[in-house]
Amino acid sequence: VTIQNTCGVKNIYPIPAQIVKEQIQAVTEDMQIDALKIGMVTDEGIIAVIADFLSSNRLPAVFDTVLVSSSGYSLVKPEALHVMRDRLIPHCTLVTPNLPEAEILSGIPIRNIEDMANAGRQILTYGCRSY
């Protein structure tokens, strides 16, 4: 849950990973899931729960990386980035970073189109099928 207004993000209160797991279980007991859209994931626990679900369910998954607010506030714990790269992105069909998010995910500063292409290629090495 984010505390924010039109000026920016003031604070973030992550939902415990167990709640995310229980919500996924509740939905999958109720209906067939054909695809998954992933948005803001703030910590390793939540990322692991989603990655585990995708690992055992092999669904098409779009990861709309929400890493930084428009006002520059970091929305993901720095220590969660490696879990995102190693455990979640390999299960994603499509990853949709904007430029600042692509810089964070790839570790490549983006100043021109060539940098953008290099960052995209780096993100592909994490195992997603497209970026």
PLM feature segments, named:
Residues V66, G72-S74, P100-E103:
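Glycine/proline-rich, positively charged
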